[in-house]
């Protein structure tokens, strides 16, 4: 055991003229010399490295206990102590003294310090002596499999005052000082929610923090992350994306209404539709259970476990689709279904599904293809809004937009007049175009720019971790840029709700999809939508001669959007590898009576 004189000699000889960092304040200081060798404890003067007046004097006294040295200031009461470490001084062995203490009497205040930040330790946690703050930080990081990045050179100051500035360096310091990751238990969940998301600690809750100002939606400043320990890859969003969507001083609207209030009463709220599809999925599951209860139980188990999504995809049964359908429905908060009973009741009298055997030439009927009630496009975002944008919030928001688009199509009598088979075929063929138009229409309320920036950040992260090939990354990046370019161009055109409704109708009634029946009838509906669109533009924008042409020229860009990539970006984190095409028939096969039955659930 080195004596205090030897330690002092090491300090003076090895660090003379060197700059060291005070761990409590992060101040850069320099050891100058030693004073008064006759004192009971060695005294050292520490000055700022710029040569300014010496600010602190420390006393180093050796304790009788091996491996412990007391550091104190002669002018303080041991509360605001300055300390530093040498190879013989470990932070976990430092204890603080007041000036009038002596080695014989023992210190007035004796307590261990956190090995990570130097704060007062509360005990040994996960294998190291730490404070409560570092204990909680380490537990959250390991349980949720969070990963961070350092904006500096990975040697940031971690002390009591600066420990929250760099989470990457703080976590690395926790591990370096002996905190064991395998000592952290998975979070326990209540019994009543055991059927929810798997208790796997690494299940889609990892975070990427992006400091984001929504007032400038295209200028995100991301903090990129790395996760060398993650081996599971279920898609682009498997790492989870978290973006701060609550900047101070920015008003965030959770609902957008594209037309006047008079149209709102004619549009059923999305939460009612959620109740309908939840009920339908439950009926489907009950039917499957009567045929094979064991198989259905396994399907439910797999669908609730992120680690089994690949197996979930391979099963390809009706129960699989119903379960994915149920998952989408749950994302739409079915508990709010009673809010719009009157809206659905109003629709029931005007919308009638016509089977494929019916032959009705709807073009001979009087009245427009679209009315004011078909212009309303009210998107309600998930509530409460989280502080950080995550993969489930993105999936829930996208699911609401998807169901709202399907709900809008069902409200058009001409669409229902085509019959069930044709309706399903049309939506399967063009749901991606309708969804993309919805993204542009709800650009602000969904914070689409922030979501797209999140996707880009995740691509960079996946490339750094070699989770994705360069070709795959290029394909995804091109799709994201196409989305951004399309939405930006639509926003710049200041398109109103009527124009969006007619654009969607023109897309929906496209007769060029193979396998469609009554193609002539579908083409007539499209022509009727175009004529009404032209009349509206002429009356509303008489001075803008080329507005109609500019809007129609944006539609070909929709065909460049890959539906499979859209599914991976927006829905895979919610329903795994289930295709949207498999979910669409469940939505469109609902009878009008089911709306009223489930609206009171």
UniProtKB/Swiss-Prot annotation:
Gene3D superfamilies, per database record: Erythroid Transcription Factor GATA-1, subunit A, Retinoid X Receptor
Primary gene name: NR2C1
Its biological purpose: Orphan nuclear receptor. Binds the IR7 element in the promoter of its own gene in an autoregulatory negative feedback mechanism. Primarily repressor of a broad range of genes including ESR1 and RARB. Together with NR2C2, forms the core of the DRED (direct repeat erythroid-definitive) complex that represses embryonic and fetal globin transcription. Binds to hormone response elements (HREs) consisting of two 5'-AGGTCA-3' half site direct repeat consensus sequences. Also activator of OCT4 gene expression.
Modifications the protein undergoes after translation, according to the UniProt entry: Sumoylation requires both PIAS1 and UBE2I. Sumoylation appears to dissociate NR2C1 from the PML nuclear bodies. Enhances the interaction with NRIP1 but inhibits interaction with KAT2B. In proliferating cells, stimulation by all-trans retinoic acid, activation of MAPK1-mediated phosphorylation and recruitment to PML bodies with subsequent sumoylation, suppresses OCT4 expression.
Region ranges (Required for interaction with KAT2B): 1-179
Full protein name: Nuclear receptor subfamily 2 group C member 1
SUPFAM superfamilies: Glucocorticoid receptor-like (DNA-binding domain), Nuclear receptor ligand-binding domain
Residues found modified as Phosphothreonine: 221, 223
Zinc finger (NR C4-type): 114-134, 150-169
InterPro entries in alphabetical order: NHR-like_dom_sf, NR2C1/2-like_DBD, NR2C1/2-like_LBD, Nucl_hrmn_rcpt_lig-bd, Nuclear_hormone_rcpt_NR2, Nuclear_hrmn_rcpt, Znf_hrmn_rcpt, Znf_NHR/GATA
Modified sites of kind Phosphoserine: 198, 216, 582
One CC-aspect GO term: PML body
């Amino acid at each position: 055991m080195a004596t205090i004189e030897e330690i002092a000699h090491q300090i003076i000889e090895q660090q003379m003229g060197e700059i060291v960092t005070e761990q409590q304040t992060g101040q850069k200081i320099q050891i100058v010399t030693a004073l008064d060798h006759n004192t009971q404890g060695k005294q050292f003067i520490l000055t700022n490295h710029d040569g300014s007046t010496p600010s602190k004097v420390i006393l180093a006294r050796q304790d009788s206990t091996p491996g412990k040295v007391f550091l104190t200031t002669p002018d303080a009461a041991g509360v605001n102590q300055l300390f530093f470490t040498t190879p013989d001084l470990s932070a976990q062995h430092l204890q603080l003294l007041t000036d009038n203490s002596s080695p014989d009497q023992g210190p007035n205040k004796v307590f261990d310090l956190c090995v990570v930040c130097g704060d007062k330790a509360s005990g040994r946690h996960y294998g190291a002596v730490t404070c409560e703050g570092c204990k909680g930080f380490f537990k959250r990081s390991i349980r949720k499999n969070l990963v961070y990045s350092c904006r500096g050179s990975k040697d940031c100051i971690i002390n009591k005052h600066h420990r929250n500035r760099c989470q990457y360096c703080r976590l690395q310091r926790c591990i370096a000082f002996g905190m064991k990751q395998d000592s952290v238990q998975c979070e326990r969940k209540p019994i009543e929610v055991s059927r929810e998301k798997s208790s796997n600690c690494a299940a889609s809750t990892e975070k990427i923090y992006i400091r984001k100002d929504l007032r400038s939606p295209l200028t995100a400043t991301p903090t990129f992350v790395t996760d060398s320990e993650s081996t599971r890859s279920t898609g682009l969003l498997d790492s989870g994306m978290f973006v701060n969507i609550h900047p101070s001083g920015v008003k965030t609207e959770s609902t957008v209404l594209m037309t006047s209030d008079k149209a709102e009463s004619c549009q059923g709220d999305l939460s009612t539709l959620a109740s309908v599809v939840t009920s339908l999925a439950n009926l489907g599951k009950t039917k499957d259970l009567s045929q094979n209860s064991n198989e259905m139980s396994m399907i439910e188990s797999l669908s609730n476990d992120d680690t089994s999504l690949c197996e979930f995809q391979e099963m390809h049964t009706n129960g699989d689709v119903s379960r994915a359908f149920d998952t989408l429905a749950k994302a739409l908060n079915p508990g709010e279904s009673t809010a719009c009973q009157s809206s659905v009741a109003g629709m029931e009298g005007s919308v009638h599904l016509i089977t494929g055997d019916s032959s009705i030439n709807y073009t001979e009927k009087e009245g427009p293809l679209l009315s004011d009630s078909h212009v309303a496009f009210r998107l309600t975002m998930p509530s409460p809004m989280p502080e950080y944008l995550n993969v489930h919030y993105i999936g829930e928001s996208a699911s609401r937009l998807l169901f709202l688009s399907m709900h809008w199509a069902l409200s058009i009598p001409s669409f229902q007049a085509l019959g069930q088979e044709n309706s399903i075929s049309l939506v399967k063929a063009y749901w991606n175009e309708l969804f993309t138009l919805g993204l542009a229409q709800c650009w602000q309320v969904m914070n689409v720019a922030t979501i797209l920036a999140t996707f880009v950040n995740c691509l960079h992260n996946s490339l750094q971790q070699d989770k994705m090939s360069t070709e795959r990354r290029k394909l995804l990046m091109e799709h994201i840029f196409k989305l951004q370019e399309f939405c930006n161009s639509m926003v710049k055109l200041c398109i109103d709700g009527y124009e969006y409704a007619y654009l969607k109708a023109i897309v929906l009634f496209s007769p060029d999809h193979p396998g469609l029946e009554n193609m002539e009838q579908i083409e007539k509906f499209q022509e009727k939508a175009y004529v009404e669109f032209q009349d509206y533009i002429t009356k509303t924008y008489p001075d803008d001669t080329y507005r109609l042409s500019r809007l129609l020229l944006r539609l070909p860009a929709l065909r460049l959007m890959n539906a499979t990539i859209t599914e991976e970006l927006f829905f895979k984190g919610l329903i795994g590898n289930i295709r949207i095409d498999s979910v669409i028939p469940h939505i469109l096969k609902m009878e009008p009576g089911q709306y009223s039955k489930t609206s009171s659930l």
